[in-house]
Amino acid sequence: MEKKRLAGLDGIRLWAIILIVAEHTGFITENGAVGVALCFVLSGFLAVYIGGEHPEEKFFSLKKWIQYYVQRAFRILPMYYFCIAFYFYFYPSICFGSWDSVLRHFTFREAGIHFWYLQQEVFMYLFLPLIMLILGILGHFVLKKLGDKKEWVYIVLLLGFAYYFKHHPLLHLYGNNSMQVFRIYLFMMGMATGYFCRMMKRREWNLSKGKAVVGNVAANLVILAVFLVTLLSSPMFLIKVGIDIRGQYYGVGHDMYFGVLAMVWIVCAVFCTAGPIVKFFGNPVFVHLSERSFGIYLFHMLLRINATAAVPDGYKSFMIIMFFSICIAEVLYVILEKPMGDFGKHLSFKKLGQYYKGLFVRE
């Protein structure tokens, strides 16, 4: 499978982060859970879609397990630990009552305020190799005669277990001062989407020019419709047309609905590369900001705490916090996130040294 970057997916990730920040700043109420659902499904999709040919079989090797965990660790932990240390030093009362609490955060046994999202994602990455190994064993030893059609079985199994784990949680994690359901079902929905897109990409689509145009137009309209649903389904908009769902917090209670919308959006973004809506979500600015979205997510809450007294909730608070979050994320991406992520792939101190030398030393 060709590892070609799909810019439209960056637009999904950035929009998800915007929804989360918008809720935390009181700009768009109760839509943060929608953003979380988009992120989890997208993470599951990418785990399969860019995993190379037969990604489930690579985990037959213990070396691949270790490689995978090392890459994920260097991608996530340096930024996370830096953020935890920063919060603890300047604002220890926010979510850390003691050094023991800091240790629990470091090991993801506890996750205060917005860190619960990252806690969920880390556990999803811990489970991913096991899920892929089970699929690989099934495909290699039981479904081998089906060839590539065995991926339909993977899809059915992943969606079936996603539905099961939604109603019978695999486990609970302590995050944001309460026991949170482990949302691995959203991750599995994304994985199923990844297998579906892989299969469809392998097919020969001999479409006429007219059919291709119609398909692109339809995909653009579907993406626009999904985007509008994720935005306008906020209670702050619905109440203006006489629909009052305040207190129901539908995003958490019915996040599988938004997971399905995320699946639809992803499929359209993968197969549609033309049209104004697709180009809008895949524009270079969105791609750039999406790459920094991890830093934006980690540090926006710190700015939110500082801005509470100075700027009231709403549009101004959102714009100010988003701007400064982007500035912080930009700096940290260059000096920490990118080099550590690359180091996790190559484990080369030489390349790491060359990166920092090129960054700070001008010939």
Segments (PLM) and residue ranges:
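Juxtamembrane loop-transmembrane helix junctions in multi-pass integral membrane proteins
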Residues: 1-7, 27-30, 68, 173-176, ...
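Interfacial loop-to-helix transition and helix-capping segments at the boundaries
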Residues: 27-38, 106-120, 124, 167-189, ...
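Membrane-interface helix-boundary motifs at transmembrane edges
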Residues: 60-62, 136-149, 199-214, 275-284
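Alpha-helical transmembrane segments of multi-pass integral membrane proteins
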Residues: 89, 187, 191-192, 216-342
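Alpha-helical transmembrane segments in multipass membrane proteins, preferentially the mid-helix core
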Residues: 129, 133, 192-203, 265-274
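Extended low-complexity acidic/polar segments
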Residues: 180, 189-200, 209-218
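Hydrophobic transmembrane helix bundles of membrane-integrated enzymes that assemble
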Residues: 151-157, 184, 188, 192-197
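Membrane-cytosol interface segments of multi-pass membrane proteins
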Residues: 1-163, 170, 221, 287, ...
